[in-house]
Each structure stands twice: as structure tokens, then as C-alpha cells.
Design a protein with these regions (language model features):
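Glycine-rich phosphate-binding loops of nucleotide-dependent enzymes
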Residues: 1-206
Length: 206
């Protein structure tokens, strides 16, 4: 059974967590696959500025919990609250629009796109232009494209990847692909970021 443990960290904006509702709360969460119970009676609450780790042996259900939180799976029982809002009946896209982003145990990048374009996929919710502007390449289109380019490079620089912006994502070393997946998740400006084994495949320096 997976277990939630606190991770020592610096709370950079602690005042937001005082007498505030948690950004994520699970109550008695569970799911059955046929006659097999994969997760049962899972409870947790995470504050807006907290960092927590979900630990457990292989097969304990950690990734299944992530899939329940992001609605890849619909729970058999229990509730998931995001910033005080019930996610019952929500789709994966709707949960994403509620401010939840995640990475995957198995990398899910667009390998044929450039590193920069992968980041722009995460930016699309926040940098918009009309279909007409895009088709006719109007000034508003180019303005938004410049904004997306600058923001993508800014995010890539967090992981020292700005010089890789023009590389094909699928050609990157495994550890760099892991970092790119995190950058793409950050591009969505999430309120809650879920990282499924983010350090897998990275060397100690990474």
C-alpha cells in the first residue's frame, strides 16, 4: 500500500497555507479492477506550498493513485478534491484545466517535435490567438508566437536546456527527456504538480 510522507523543504510562501483549504485532498479513495483491489482507503491532504512524496514498493499502487488523481482512472469509491472542488465525473482534460499537471513513469513526449515545441504544447492554454489570425499570419499571431518562444526558453533555462531548444525531443538522452517532461508540465502553470518517478534514468549530477 502506498504511503504519503512529508519531504523536508523550504516553504517559500507559508502564509498561504495558514487556515487555508488544501490544494489536494483525497478521502477513502479506492479502485477495483474486476475482483482485484488495487488501491483501498487512501487518504491524504496537501497544502498549497507543501512538497510530499508517495513511497512504496513496486506494485504498491503509486502510479494507480496518480491515475486516480488525474482521472486516467475513475475511482470505484472515495473522493478527490482539487482546491476545494470535487473532481467526481471530471475528465483528464477537465482536471488539467483545474490546475493539475503531471509527468509519467514512462516518458510521454512528442519525440518527432523539437524540444521547444514540446514546451509550447504545455503553453497552449495560456498563449492563444484566433484561428483566422493563425491562418492569415496576422501581427497578433506573430506576437503570441514570440511570447511563446520567449516563455519556452525561460522555462528550459530552469534545467539548463535552452541550448537544446531546436533539438528533436526523441534524440535527447533519457535524463534530458525526463527534464523536458517536467518543463512541459511547468508550462501549464499548474497549481498542483505530480511527478511520477521524475529522477528515473538521471545520473547523480542531474
Amino acid at each position: 500500500k502506498p504511503k504519503l510522507v512529508p519531504v523536508p523543504s523550504t516553504n517559500i510562501i507559508p502564509e498561504r497555507d495558514v487556515d487555508k483549504r488544501p490544494i489536494l485532498e483525497c478521502r477513502h479513495l479506492g479502485i477495483d479492477f474486476g475482483g482485484l483491489t488495487a488501491v483501498d482507503d487512501f487518504n491524504m491532504a496537501i497544502g498549497r506550498t507543501e512538497i510530499a512524496g508517495l513511497i512504496g514498493p513496486n506494485g504498491a499502487g503509486k502510479t494507480t493513485v496518480f491515475n486516480l488523481l488525474t482521472k486516467v482512472y475513475q475511482p470505484t469509491r472515495g473522493t478527490v478534491m482539487i482546491d476545494g472542488r470535487d473532481t467526481a465525473g471530471k475528465t483528464t482534460i477537465q482536471v488539467s484545466h483545474m490546475g493539475v499537471a503531471r509527468t509519467f513513469q514512462n516518458i510521454r513526449l512528442f519525440g518527432n517535435l523539437t524540444v521547444e515545441d514540446n514546451v509550447k504544447v504545455g503553453l497552449h492554454e495560456h498563449i492563444k490567438y484566433s484561428a483566422l489570425s493563425g491562418i492569415l499570419r496576422l501581427p497578433s499571431y506573430w506576437k503570441k508566437e514570440r511570447e511563446a518562444h520567449e516563455k519556452a526558453l525561460e522555462l528550459l533555462s530552469i534545467f539548463d536546456m535552452q541550448d537544446m531548444a531546436g533539438y528533436q525531443a526523441g534524440s535527447l538522452p533519457y535524463g534530458a527527456q525526463r527534464r523536458l517532461e517536467i518543463v512541459r508540465a511547468l508550462a501549464t502553470k499548474p497549481s498542483l504538480l505530480l511527478l511520477d518517478e521524475p529522477a528515473a534514468g538521471m545520473n547523480p549530477s542531474e
